[in-house]
């Protein structure tokens, strides 16, 4: 999934799904699909960086060897649900949502996002339940979690009291 970061706005504009494809081929496809775009970061599941069995290289290493540097995100379903809900609920200005999803570029995400439900097990009420079509939503949440600390500019004006202004001089 490709998401444009416009300061405090995020626009999901492109997605691609791969089935039964090796990591090196996916990396080549990502590079081809990203031609002409200024890709700043690629986020992945932390499980991609785990050595399993006798593997010398991890899946993340394979991507990086093929030209796609990756940064591991957080793997926590409670954070997934909170990140997506917060991004959909916030506005950067009146009528302009913080997160926009282009229907022409992300039809799978638009189709599967409403299918996501909360996990009803005790202690996980705020977590996103596991679902066979959760891949696009998890990808979106990896991005949102990694950008959770981005500056959020409110569209409401806050009046700064005179005594808090930098040029204010106290008189005694």
Where are each of the predicted segments found?
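Acidic, Mg2+-coordinating catalytic module of metal-dependent nucleases/exonucleases
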Residues: 128-156
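Gly/Thr-rich phosphate-binding beta-strand-loop-beta motif of the actin/hexokinase/Hsp70
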Residues: 1-6
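Mg2+-dependent endonuclease catalytic cores in nucleic-acid-processing enzymes, primarily RNase H-like
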Residues: 7-125, 131, 150, 162-172
